[in-house]
Curated annotation (Swiss-Prot):
Monomer. Belongs to the IPP transferase family. ATP binds at residues 10-17. GO terms for molecular function: ATP binding; tRNA dimethylallyltransferase activity. Keywords: ATP-binding, Magnesium, Nucleotide-binding, Transferase, tRNA processing. It catalyses: adenosine(37) in tRNA + dimethylallyl diphosphate = N(6)-dimethylallyladenosine(37) in tRNA + diphosphate. This is tRNA dimethylallyltransferase. SUPFAM superfamilies: P-loop containing nucleoside triphosphate hydrolases. Pfam families: IPPT. It is an enzyme of class 2 (transferase). Catalyzes the transfer of a dimethylallyl group onto the adenine at position 37 in tRNAs that read codons beginning with uridine, leading to the formation of N6-(dimethylallyl)adenosine (i(6)A). Substrate binds at residues 12-17.
Length: 315
C-alpha cells in the first residue's frame, strides 16, 4: 500500500514550522526536516532550527545529524527521508516533511534516480580550481550563461551545487533544470503538497525582524564558535546567516553591514524559494499573511489534507 505523506513548503519565515507542529498534533504526525542546513549540529539560531521546548511533544527527524564540515548530499537525504517515511508509516503515524530546500524534498518524494546522473570527475576538479582562483561568483556567472533557471535558484555560495549543474550541462548538453525535469517521473507517495505564502511586504518585514531576533538570541556568538574552530572550507558555513558574519570576522565589512547583507540575502532567498516551488511542484497554496488567522488556516489546511488523503483527526 502506498504511504500517505504531507509536505509543507514555502519561503523562510512564512510559518512552516509552526504549522507543521499544529498539523502533526491533529493528524498523529511526525516531522521530517526538509532543510539542508538544519542537519548540522551547532547551527541552531542561524538555521531557525525548532527548539526542543517548541516541539510540543511532536517527534522531529533529521535535525543535528552531522557535524558542520561532514559531507552530506541530496542522495543521502533521499535515502534517510525515504527510510523515515517507511518507518513512521509502519508505526501508524503520518510523515510530515517540513522545509524550504526544494531539491531535497523533491528528491525524497519523487522517483528521482541519481544513479542516472552523468558525471565527469576531471571537469569537476577544474571547476573547483576555478572557484578557488576566481571565486564562487565567477562560477555562478558561468551557470547563469548556460542555465539561467538553475542559476536563479542556486545560491552563488553553494559551490557544490553550482558545479553539479555545470557538470550535467557539460556531460549532456542540456541545462541542469531541463535534466531535472526529465528525472521527475512520478510521486512515490500519496501526497498532500502544501505551500505557504504571504504578501511580500509582510514576509520581508518578518524576515528583517527575525534577523534582529537572531542577533539578540546569540547568532554572532554561534557563528563565532564555528569561526574560531577554523571551519571555513565547507558548505555549511557558506549558508545565509553564517557567510555574512564570517565576512565581518574577517574584517571585510562592519557588523552593521553584515547584518544588512544578511537581511538582504534572506529576502532574496525567500523570493527564489517561492519561484522554485511555484515552477517545480504541484503545490496547493495557502496565504499566511495574517497571523491572527493562524487557527483558521490550520483548520482550512487540515480539511484539505483530510480530503486529499482521506484522513481523520488524531489518526
Amino acid at each position: 500500500m502506498t504511504e500517505k505523506i504531507v509536505v509543507i513548503v514555502g519561503p523562510t519565515e512564512v510559518g512552516k514550522t509552526k504549522l507543521g507542529i499544529a498539523l502533526a498534533k491533529k493528524l498523529g504526525g511526525e516531522i521530517i526536516s526538509g532543510d539542508s542546513m538544519q542537519i548540522y549540529k551547532g547551527m541552531d539560531i542561524g538555521t531557525a532550527k525548532v527548539k526542543p521546548d517548541e516541539m510540543e511533544g511532536v517527534p522531529h527527524h533529521l535535525l543535528d545529524i552531522k557535524e558542520p564540515c561532514e559531507p552530506f548530499s541530496v542522495v543521502e537525504f533521499q535515502r534517510l527521508a525515504r527510510a523515515l517515511i517507511t518507518d513512521i508509516s509502519a508505526r501508524g503515524r503520518l510523515p510530515i516533511i517540513v522545509g524550504g530546500t526544494g531539491l531535497y524534498i523533491q528528491a525524497a518524494i519523487y522517483d528521482y534516480r541519481f544513479s542516472d546522473a552523468p558525471s565527469d570527475e576531471a571537469y569537476r576538479r577544474a571547476l573547483r580550481q576555478l572557484a578557488a582562483e576566481q571565486g564562487a561568483e565567477a562560477l555562478h556567472e558561468q551557470l547563469k550563461a548556460v542555465d539561467p533557471e538553475s542559476a536563479a535558484r542556486i545560491h552563488p555560495n553553494n559551490v557544490r551545487r553550482v558545479i553539479r549543474a555545470l557538470e550535467v550541462y557539460h556531460c549532456t548538453g542540456k541545462p541542469f533544470s531541463e535534466w531535472q525535469r526529465g528525472q521527475q517521473r512520478q510521486l512515490l507517495y500519496e501526497t498532500a503538497l502544501i505551500g505557504l505564502t504571504a504578501e511580500r511586504s509582510v514576509l520581508y518585514r518578518r524576515i528583517n525582524e527575525r534577523v534582529d531576533e537572531m542577533i539578540a538570541e546569540g547568532l554572532i556568538e554561534e557563528v563565532r564558535s564555528l569561526y574560531d574552530r577554523g571551519l571555513r572550507d565547507c558548505q555549511a558555513v557558506q549558508a545565509i546567516g553564517y557567510k555574512e558574519l564570517y565576512d565581518y570576522f574577517d574584517g571585510r565589512v562592519s557588523l552593521d553591514e553584515a547584518i544588512e547583507q544578511l537581511k538582504q540575502n534572506s529576502r532574496r532567498y525567500a523570493k527564489r524559494q517561492l519561484t522554485w516551488f511555484r515552477n517545480q511542484m504541484p503545490v496547493e497554496w495557502f496565504d499566511m499573511t495574517d497571523p491572527e488567522k493562524f487557527a483558521v488556516k490550520v483548520e482550512e489546511i487540515f480539511r484539505y489534507i483530510a480530503g486529499k488523503l482521506r484522513l481523520e483527526a488524531n489518526i
